């Protein structure tokens, strides 16, 4: 019985092992790619553990079989064993091909409890594996046999120890046998149920050794053909195969022991001691392997035609072989060490539990595997189907694209023609055909939200394309423009520009966009609650003209407040209630609405509601006390009760106390309306009596675009309405009010503007002369300049301001003003102005105009500002930022310049010389292009102006610039003074008569000389024609005198020589008398009064001039006489000439002394006048005296030169006449006389020239001395005067 039971157990265990093998294979096949690494590690560990267990189990089973054979040997058992060995040899190949997988399954705790004859089946399997050339299996068997079977070489001591351990093992085996019998019965019932369902096939036949795939298929067929009636025979065959395997194992073990190392032999006793635990593990191993084999046969039968699974199995088997080869024999100890602590009972119970679970779930596993295979096939089919559908879709898309392209190419020309015809087709007409381009614009513009963002350039293009104002696209563009303009104006509004913003808003069509206006105002107020009073004032102005807009905004605010109150949104409640409070202050809303809101907030008090009520009271408390004192009194009583109850937070209670204090102060810090925002009169305002319950609909439809069929008519109506409201201002913005009008509308609006511009403004128009925009511009420029680090950054910021045309000059004025305000000149401003002139030429002309205006108004600038301004313009000039032609406004003379302008010119040219250098500046000023512009700076029209210019530039240290002027002044023709009319009227007089009558007529000549001097001053600027006429008249008079003299000389030659000597003596006496008289007159003049000083000086000058003339004429005559008598009396001549020279020198010294005394006297007189008049008229007197002093030497020089020229002319004419007369009288016989005359003429000429040169030299020396003395005195006077001025300024 025990044998049959063991055979049944082995069969069931083999079936169960086949099932488990199939499960593990299916799982590993489906998850092959994922769990390759895991299966390798687990299979290695499990093989190590199971090898040790199998060796112990084989030893136990061999002992049991020997006992059973000795008890019940029979023929039937032998036959059954033979059959079983044959069948097992065939089936072992299939089961052993999956040995690696069975080992992994057994390691997870799925170990069967069947014991008995599983070791025999393992031996048979090992033989078949050896035949089928499976090296991994052979290595496992060799390891087992080496561990279990003791070789001949082992010592007797070790054998005796093994014999002592056998009875202990037998006791354990008896208990195991009992437990296995129970489990075997259960496995037999399960196996019978499974075998009934299997098909009966032919009995198994031995097959030749082939590849693993073929062996496994045949084994599956043979295992499926088994029947329950032959199980006993199989068990007998298995027992026989066990015996054979044991013998062969002994021989192999001995053989391997011979080959093995001595270390293994030493370890064998320790292994034999641990055999019981190994036997248990080997039993579980055999059972699990049989179960895996059965399951794998079923799975292979279902998926026999799948080639992919075969390839996977081949790769798996090869990997398992490689792993088994790589294992070392020494690793079998590790699982033993791990499981030393486990008791045999515990391990048995665990194996039983796993076996029960496995047996119950075998059917479920089979079903699951079948479902899994079906699902895999289903997925494959679905994948194929999806790929096919995708390919079809792509083909259809390609075909559609080709069709669309062909359609487009065919109909492009047709669409182009239809565009022109249907361009103005409106969207309202459903029958109208519109183009693709128009459809796109309509799609973008007619959506509710406005569609995507359209850039301004594209929007203008779209607007230009749409020519029909009644179309939806055009109205949509106008709507978007209206929305942007309203939103922009609302964001710009403040206390200062509220009037301007209101006018601009009224120019827009706010009746059409009233929803947009109310929404933007509410949004702006919520974003900036501090400007609530400004928005309320704006609403009040609009409400006075359009009450429906004010009512709509008030409705929306009340609805917003109610919603926020229901939602407990404190921030929205605060903002909306604050706006309503200011609307109550502006009389847009009635006070009943405010009282209703307060009662709503206070009747059910919470911390938030009371806080909102207090904020509301602060804003409109003053107005409510004026309008309804009882109502606000009731509100404050309710607040007092809330405060006494003390249920609220301490913070809120403190706020209530603060409100009572504010009320006590009369809301002085919370005024209802400030003065600058009281823009609407009380009679013009429209107050809305709106209650909390009345506000129901916010009319949000007005916020969205709506097509208007009468768009043009409504726009014209609103234009007329805005003109009535605004007056003439509305006509200025007709073109921009629509903000979406095309070129036709703009041209018509401009025509209207022109017609209305001709009309005179009405009396009610307001003209803003405060120049607020100009002030704001100057403020921004000033702040930008002061906030910049360098001039480049400042220029960049100012260029980004985008100034309007005409504002460039304001920018230039700001540059100059900022520069003038500095304590010292900063180059920053010059560089900034230069940069603007270089960037844009439009700034050059404003700077040139500012230069001219500044030069004309230099007297208004103080010294510091004058210095900075002149240096600023010097920088612009030397950098050529502005033209040098601006210097034509400067006229450098005494009359056209002031002290401020001279200082301006001085600093300007000194700065230019510092920047450019004197040579470069001189070169620039000599440029022919600038000659006309610099004519005022370097005047050549009048010597007086020329000298002033030379003296000015010399005084400022730039005399090198006046070299050309100095040269011009030297080479210029000197003006000849006009000759007195009395002198011209007189007849020519003899020399003797003129000399005798000179003393008697001294007074008359002095007066005539003074008159001639005055006339010469007045006629200094006369024309050249007058001077030429005067000179011609003088030459005629000289000719007449010369003729008379020639006649007299002829007569005198015939007269006696005695008369000549008498005349000469009489002349000398007369000259001495004249000199004495002159001395007396000069002494008298020094003691005379101040009024007669001028006349006496002029008379002395005239006398000196006349005396010099008479002396020169007398000297000439005396020289002639002495020369004629030189042969006879040479000593007299030399004495006379010496005496005359001494007398002349004395006369000159006397004149200088007298002049010096006159000058001193005049200076004293001027100082006295200056002290009397307070220094006012001193400049004028000095100027006049200086003029006279300058003109006196000029007159002298001119007169002396004129007289010399006249003398030379007379001598020449006389000599010519004399030579002619002599030639006529004597003819050719008077050659000797002619030679004598020529020699005499030459000697006379030499004498004359010598005398003239000596006189000239003496005169020049005297003149230079007097001039240097005058200059020194002048400097001393100026220095003393400057001291007086400085001291007076310092004293105040």
UniProtKB/Swiss-Prot annotation:
Annotated Basic and acidic residues bias: 22-37, 58-79, 154-182, 246-258, 292-311, 358-380, 388-423, 1145-1218, 1230-1292
InterPro entries from the entry? ARM-type_fold, CWC22_splicing_factor, Initiation_fac_eIF4g_MI, MIF4G-like_typ-3
Q: Which GO terms describe its cellular component?
A: catalytic step 2 spliceosome; nuclear speck
The keyword Amino-acid biosynthesis is assigned to this record: no
Q: Where is the composition biased (Basic residues)?
A: 264-291, 312-357, 1040-1083, 1118-1135
**Which residues are in the MI domain?**
776-892
Query: Where are stretches of biased composition, namely Acidic residues?
Result: 743-756
Explain the consequences of disrupting this gene. Answer: Early lethality in both males and females.
In this chain, the stretch annotated as Disordered covers 1-425, 726-767, 989-1292
Any signal peptide, and if so, which residues? Answer: none
The answer to whether the entry has keyword Nucleus is yes
From start to end residue, where is composition biased (Low complexity)? 1-19, 45-56, 88-119, 727-742, 992-1034, 1095-1113
Q: Where is the composition biased (Polar residues)?
A: 183-195
Q: Where in the cell is it found?
A: Nucleus speckle
Family membership, please give it: Belongs to the CWC22 family.
Record note on quaternary structure: Component of the spliceosome C complex.
Q: What is this protein called?
A: Pre-mRNA-splicing factor CWC22 homolog
